[in-house]
Amino acid sequence: MLTAVKVVAIILGMLLVDRVGRRPLLLWGSISMFAALVVTAVIMLTAPQVAQDGGGTAPDLASSPLLGILALVALCLYVGAYAGTWGPIMWVLIGEMFPNRMRGAATSVAGGVEWASNFAVTLTFPVLAAWSIGTTYAVYAIIALASILFVLKLVPETKNLELEQMDDIADAPAASART
């Protein structure tokens, strides 16, 4: 099911990236991921708890079919939002958003930050989830909220721009860079 969601989202993202623009898609993706993570956090924090074999407790989503369905829908929303927006668009955007004088170095740094972020999530999720799965999703929701602010404040729209135009945008005041 998640693979189908990913495939559909990637196709939609490919079809929309040059029509709608990078910035609106990233903003939609961030808002959708934030909403999905908040819903998941609330479900995991409020669901009845069941004892685990190794000690501790975990949310018992089987005790309430509605909670299980909501958690699945939220998971699909998150996966689809990421797969259709941040997953592929970030790579397009980092190749377009930097002025020529710094494009090579900035693209390398941005790609490295993306990989480091993925590594950090992969490394921290099991540890945080063992502590509290609901709180883990809440922390990631806060990060998704920060991505909304990041897009609103710092990400310029690069749709229909020549790479050389990024020099002018980089030299302009921040407010005029966000079209």
Residue ranges and their predicted role:
Residues 1-179:
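Alpha-helical transmembrane bundle of multi-pass membrane proteins
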